Amino acid sequence: MPLTKIELNNVTVFHELAVEFDPGVNILLGENGVGKTHIMKLLYAACQAKKSEVTFPYKTVMVFRPDDSNLGRLVNRNADSTNGASVRVSSDDASMAMKFSQKTTKYDADVTGKASWEKQLSDLSSVFIPAKEILSNAWNLSNAVRQGNIIFDDTFSR
């Protein structure tokens, strides 16, 4: 696996988090609302930033869609906002980091490590498949929902 670690400080629901990945398949488990999807979205944004025309802050804004497209909206509001927020994604031979604060507008984060990130991950392909899309392809799931055998929120529809 090209990605080896993600470190988050004051980002969305996280005060401080460091996750090291094992080679092969990694599985994120946890209750609803603990940030599993946020981790996957940040990893996806970092992987997409290996393209020279795509920046880490831009792709992060595009996958989270914060109010007014402001990256600063992703700073954890319960944390000490004077420190701002940071994300670092690492691979075997490179890392890329992004720092921003509540005052950061649009995509104006400080990014370090972009050049080495692009060079090392240039042949990487990544895809993000939302859980809803996986569920919608499950055989006979729509019938089970319609009959009330399985209950999903209103975001699930076919």
Tell me what each language-model feature is.
Residues 1-44:
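Pre-Walker A-like glycine/lysine-rich segment at the N-terminus of P-loop NTPase domains
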Residues 7, 49-158:
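Phosphate-coordinating catalytic segments in nucleotide- and nucleic-acid-processing enzymes
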